[in-house]
């Protein structure tokens, strides 16, 4: 339980046997260090048989973005404790409001995704709960960095791999601007026109299944952030509320 090498403890019992009290005294003396286990990340697993032993295979190069993102994801998954909570939200009124947007010049309907509203809601939540807008990158010193800016990361699935650009100062932008910037960031990522610095310095990340479907999932926190918001697809359903189905 204490990690003590019992051979280093002087026993006080007959024939040098070590008692529980001897171990406690040894620990209290602080004259030793508990050996830390060596953890090797990405240790190569050896296959007993080659894949080609069972049929035809094709060897492909992994795109650079995917190789880089896999290292970041592995680091996040192994170093950040993950606790996941699933919940549902009624977005009936949000959808009515979102689909009512029209262009003031042409009168045509404006296409604004639900993600723009979620970004705005997240920034309000971060202001109310600032610990979620932080990074714990100095854990040994017992310090955390609480950010005073609101740069929301948006997970973008591209042919090159997963990228997470930051929508800067989201708290100071309206829904129209957020919506247009979301499209701009997505296009820049898919065309590999995004500046490297724009992939860093985030407050919290949003990742959405809206494009591919799926209700619940467990996304990996984007280090050095401390939380991530996973959003499933929206759907119509009947619920029992106030004694009746609605």
List PLM regions with ranges:
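Catalytic-site-adjacent helices and loops of nucleotide signaling machinery
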Residues: 11-12
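C-terminal catalytic/motor cores of large multi-domain enzyme assemblies
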Residues: 2-4, 8, 17, 21-25, ...
């Amino acid at each position: 339980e204490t990690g003590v090498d019992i051979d280093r403890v002087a026993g006080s019992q007959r024939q040098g046997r070590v008692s529980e009290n001897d171990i406690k005294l040894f620990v209290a003396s602080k004259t030793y260090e508990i050996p830390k286990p060596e953890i090797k990340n990405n240790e190569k697993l050896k296959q007993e048989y080659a894949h080609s032993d069972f049929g035809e295979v094709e060897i492909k190069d992994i795109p650079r973005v995917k190789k880089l993102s896999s290292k970041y994801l592995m680091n996040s998954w192994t170093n950040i404790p993950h606790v996941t909570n699933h919940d549902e939200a009624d977005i009936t009124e949000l959808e009515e409001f979102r689909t009512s947007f029209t262009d003031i010049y042409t009168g045509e309907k404006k296409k604004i995704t639900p993600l723009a509203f979620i970004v705005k809601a997240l920034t309000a939540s971060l202001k109310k709960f600032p610990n979620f807008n932080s990074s714990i990158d100095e854990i040994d010193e017992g310090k955390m960095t609480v950010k005073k800016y609101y740069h929301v990361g948006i997970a973008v699935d591209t042919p090159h791999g997963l990228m997470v650009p930051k929508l800067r100062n989201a708290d100071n932008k309206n829904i129209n601007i957020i919506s247009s910037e979301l499209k701009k960031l997505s296009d820049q990522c898919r065309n590999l026109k995004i500046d490297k610095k724009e992939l860093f310095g985030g407050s919290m990340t949003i990742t959405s299944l809206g494009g591919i479907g799926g209700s619940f999932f467990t996304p990996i926190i984007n280090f050095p952030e401390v939380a991530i918001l996973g959003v499933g697809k929206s759907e119509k359903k009947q619920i029992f509320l106030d004694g009746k189905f609605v």
